[in-house]
């Protein structure tokens, strides 16, 4: 019997495997894919993500293979732009790093293995069953059936929900955001800025240009098809992507550029505020727990952080030899203390301001008010969990007052 079985070798699963194996636990890390493998994503590592990667002693390995960005540039639907430095708050790095998941996830996986985790690929897990002594993980691999037992399981299965539904953790399908991205080479006009744009994309939603080394870029668009906007939003992310790259700015940047590979779409689970995070002998991390920023769609940072939090909690469970449901519920409280208020504020910011009525006035006002600009940037990148005195009434009053 293993100490811990982790299902999913993305950032959350591999981070948990690293922290647990480093402390001497017997850790089995499973994934349905062979590595390295592509993973459709925006590829952005925010200052929050970089803080965990630095703690894992991986930042020096990632810097040479990524593209360091020092600023964020936001364009309104009308095309007005505002630029700000990344907030290096609470001792975090004042920059972001763009690293394709093909590279990032394999580095994280190998790092966990180096520190003692066992890894098995091509395992499609179909069941996780808890009992009084632990969990049994069952599934299939190319050699036939698969089975492993452990004292605790960590689910790091991303946006995929069938296994969580089979386990009884999700009673209904969560509402998801939708995104699509493609890689391009020989892109014009790239700089040290992460570019976010509300032009050409159904609101609430945005397009992005994330530079990569050697003139390449991850370019995509995401939409949030729910609430009042769900009545008129297109749910076709390919249409949103095509509309975004046909904006004047993108046409200029992509003139002569070469698309590498296909446009790939993906869902984003942002339901942390209502999502389950634990069950008997089981913890959920990252997107499996709905931990994707509801304003930006960023999830790598929260996957890494929750992977670390889960590992620390599992170590406490082993130290106390208490794997009871109330002790597992303490993990949920830790996540709520860490992320609940931030996710509420991000959801509120999206719902109040990322709409056709207010997005242009908001960007225009942010260009005039550096304090407002930095509040919004800090909220978007998970560095602030309050809107302070920003309200719709105040924004409209300032805008129409000139």
Which stretches of residues belong to each language-model region?
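Predominantly flavin-linked oxidoreductase catalytic cores and closely associated redox partners
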Residues: 111-254
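N-terminal Rossmann-fold NAD(P) dinucleotide-binding loop
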Residues: 13-14
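Conserved N-terminal glycine-rich FAD pyrophosphate-binding loop of Rossmann-like flavoproteins
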Residues: 34-54
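C-terminal helical "tail/cap" subdomain of flavin- and related membrane-associated enzymes
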Residues: 315-402
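Beta1/beta-strand and adjacent pyrophosphate-binding region of the FAD-binding site
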Residues: 1-10
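Glycine-rich FAD pyrophosphate-binding loop
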Residues: 21-41
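FAD/FMN-dependent oxidoreductases across multiple families
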Residues: 229-313
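A conserved beta-strand/loop capping segment in the N-terminal third of enzymes
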Residues: 50, 55-106
């Amino acid at each position: 019997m293993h100490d811990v079985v982790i299902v999913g070798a993305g950032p959350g699963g591999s981070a948990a495997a690293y922290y647990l194996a480093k402390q001497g636990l017997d850790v089995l890390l499973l994934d349905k894919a062979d590595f390295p493998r592509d993973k459709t994503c925006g590829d952005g590592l925010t200052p929050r993500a970089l803080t965990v990667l630095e703690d894992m002693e991986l930042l020096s390995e990632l810097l040479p293979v990524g593209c360091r960005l020092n600023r964020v540039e936001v364009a309104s639907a009308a095309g007005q732009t505002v630029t700000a430095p990344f907030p290096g708050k609470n001792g975090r790095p004042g920059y972001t790093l763009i690293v394709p998941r093909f590279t990032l996830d394999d580095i994280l996986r190998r790092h966990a293995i180096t520190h003692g985790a066992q890894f098995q690929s091509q395992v499609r897990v179909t069941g996780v069953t808890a009992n009084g002594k632990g969990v049994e993980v069952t599934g299939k691999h190319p050699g036939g059936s698969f089975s492993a037992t452990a004292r605790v399981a960590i689910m790091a299965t991303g946006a995929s929900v069938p296994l969580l539904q089979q386990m009884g953790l999700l009673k209904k399908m969560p509402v998801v955001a939708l995104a699509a991205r493609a890689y391009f080479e020989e892109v014009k006009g790239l700089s040290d800025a992460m570019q976010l744009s509300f032009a050409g994309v159904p609101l609430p939603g945005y397009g992005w240009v994330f530079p990569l080394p050697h003139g390449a870029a991850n370019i995509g668009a995401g939409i949030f098809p729910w609430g009042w906007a769900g009545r008129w939003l297109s749910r076709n992310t390919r249409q949103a992507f095509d509309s975004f790259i046909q904006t004047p700015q993108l046409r200029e940047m992509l003139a002569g550029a070469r698309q590498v590979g296909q446009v790939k779409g993906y869902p984003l689970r942002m339901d942390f505020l209502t999502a389950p995070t634990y069950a008997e002998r089981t913890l959920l991390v990252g997107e499996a727990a709905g931990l994707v920023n509801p304003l930006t769609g960023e999830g790598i940072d929260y996957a890494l952080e929750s992977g670390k939090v889960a590992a620390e909690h599992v170590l406490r469970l082993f130290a106390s030899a208490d794997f009871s449901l109330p002790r597992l519920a303490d993990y949920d409280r830790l996540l709520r203390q860490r992320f609940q208020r931030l996710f509420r504020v991000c959801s509120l910011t999206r719902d109040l301001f990322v709409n056709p009525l207010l997005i242009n006035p908001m960007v225009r006002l942010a260009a005039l008010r550096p304090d407002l600009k930095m509040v919004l940037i800090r909220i978007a990148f998970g560095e602030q969990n309050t809107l302070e005195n920003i309200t719709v009434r105040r924004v409209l009053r300032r805008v129409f007052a000139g």
